Amino acid sequence: LPIGQLFRDIAVAISVSVIVSVIISITVIPALASQFIKDAKHFDQQPRIPIIDTVASGFKGLVLAYGRKVVKSTWLGLTVVFALIASSLVVLVIMMPPLDYLPDGNRNFVFGRISVPPGYTREATLNFAQSMEDVARPLWEQSNPERLPHIDRFFFVAYNGGAFAGAATEDAGRIRELIPVLAEPVSKSPGARAFVTQASLFGRSVGGSRGILIDVLGPDFETVEPAFRLIRRQVGELFPRKAGHQVRVRPSENAVSPELVVRPNPDALARAGVSARDFAQALDVYNDGILVREIPLGGELVELVLTTQTRETAKIEDIEDIPVIARDGSLVKVGQLAEVSIESAPNQLLRKAGRRVVTIQLRLHESIPLETAIAEINSKVVFPFNIDSEDGVRLELSGAADDLSRAWDAVQANVILAIAVIYLLLVVLLRSFALPMIILITVPIAATGGILGLALLNLVMDQPLDMLTMLGFIILSGVVVNNAILMVEQTLWHIQHDGMGSVDAILEATSNRIRPIFMSTLTSLFGLLPLIIFPGAGSELYRGIGIVVFGGLLLSTLLVLFFIPPLMAILMRRFKSQEPIGDMTQEITAPLSQTA
């Protein structure tokens, strides 16, 4: 899956940057600090920022007053914690948007497949090229009154049964405006269909990462044909073209050519004493010839082919007059042994798992999430058809529908694995199985913040919950625990090294850690703002990640000050008579957070 490589590349970039920042913080930062921070008294009298400092002092006082109440009352603390967690989970379930696979990106290229009516010659198909070129020509010659984008490149290729075309614009941001321009000339021709889309950065076909494939499988084409026509009509009614959706059939139902069919008559063959194999070989001799053997000639193997002198000049009408030698040595004509007819047949035959298949390709408009469309197709088309089908015809979904299912399973597994690794790491560092559970409660709260941020962004612009956006939740699981770690570790420090009681240690840790928590969080939030606000190439790919991390980090930072103190107090009362929680070894002389 393309999403796997994307996840890996982003994960490597983040991991390397974190490792480098840690190395810099323990080597370069202390050296620079020793040179620039020589007079500690200078930092005791810092200028006040009128409004910000007043708000910050008031907020700190509010948090400490709240902390004094909840750490002294077990029931109040449990009520607050339960309310926060329950409300977060409810919001997470209710506001969880439908899933999407991958964004198409903003690639500067539109591509269209054109299906023409049966019987169109290549020359007739070229008329579509002329009509498209007539529409596109003003867009590459000079400015046009309708202010459509200028075309930088344009091509058209025609063949028997169809054609395809493509174009690119000088302004990559306006490439979508060419889709109706190129599709309009084709839509005016009776029986012709155009499937014009912007090329996807990740899609493997014309449908891109939003293309749903409905495979109609059956034993033969005669059985599949009425089924796929029914399904195509149902899909067209659910997702009409006027709403921006596009539907095409593969292989094209119009891509047919005349075919000469010879059906042997078993009774006539038996009377003449000719087997079906001998009859077929006789036809091959007059058609392309049959290979007798390969003989060496001049150091090479040369094919010895049995054919006739009239092979190149024979006409279709002459097939019935081809002589076949009967068992008694007499000559019998093909027309006496078989029925010869000219019929229409598809140019392409597709099979899946050994069965004939016709694929209906649905390209969704950007306004409908992929998960919503899949659910609607399954409930209204696939499931009812498969239940009622009695002739061996089945429907299967593939394409982006299958990719989304596999990617979603992988993302869920990655989130669980990430949380498990974080938990085990915290167990080793804190020497406790309970304290890491307190820290990890920030993860679902942060996920709620990410969903709320995504909902707010959708009020301004469309941003689906695609798999790239889901990567933001995986990143959150490793980022939002930092603030909780600061508070828990600082509380343990006050208990073990300053001899404080649990209540005083919790309140002191809350007071000490508010400033570094908000310093680190605000720098991260402002660093994410350009990713969310500013447009540009690639912004549609990573805007979802930015808003999820932004919303999750903001909400978890605000709420961590409200549920960590009561949880710590409850846990410490529970183990009051036991060995201190998180008994760190004496080798740790000072917590890393003390330097924050």
Each model region followed by its residue ranges:
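Transmembrane helices with small-residue packing motifs
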Residues: 1-6, 78, 82-120, 197, ...
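Alpha-helical membrane-interface segments at transmembrane helix boundaries
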Residues: 2-15, 59-75, 98, 232, ...
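Transmembrane alpha-helices and their membrane-interface boundaries in multi-pass membrane transporters
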Residues: 5-49, 165, 483, 518, ...
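Small-residue-enriched core segments of transmembrane alpha-helices in multipass membrane transport
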Residues: 6-25, 85-87, 105-112, 192, ...
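Hydrophobic transmembrane alpha-helices and their membrane-interface caps
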Residues: 16, 424-512, 518-534, 551, ...
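Signature of alpha-helical transmembrane segments and their immediate interfacial
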Residues: 47-101, 511, 591-593
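Solvent-exposed, membrane-proximal periplasmic/extracellular interface segments of envelope transport
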Residues: 94, 124-208, 233, 267-285
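Extracytoplasmic/periplasmic membrane-proximal domains and adjacent transmembrane bundles
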Residues: 228, 232-418, 427, 503-505
